[in-house]
Amino acid sequence: MRFTLLLVAFITPLVNATENTDWPNYASDPGSSKFAALDHINATNVQKVEVAWSWESPDNQMVKKNRKLTPWGFKSTPIKIGKTLYVSTSLGHVAAISADDGKTIWTFDTKTYADGR
């Protein structure tokens, strides 16, 4: 009986974590599963999915102004807390984006590109 209670105690937090829609860690969870247990999109409605919003990285304007900057093929996995997405860009910006409408809340320029990193 004691083993069963311990097992339930360890499994319950894992089940609750998958029901949460926040992605507070890289790739969703400490195991980097990139999985969210949501049933909003499924085989019967996937054809009807549309883009809700898009976001333009501040890197785009920087490259237009300075063609020597190269944003490489960097791909970031954002984290989501509440209604805010946090993402980094290939030129080292960090941004907070509204999950509701894709509007930029704030950006921070780390200037790592200045040192060629």
Give the location of each predicted region.
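Extracytoplasmic beta-rich repeat domains
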Residues: 55-77, 107-117
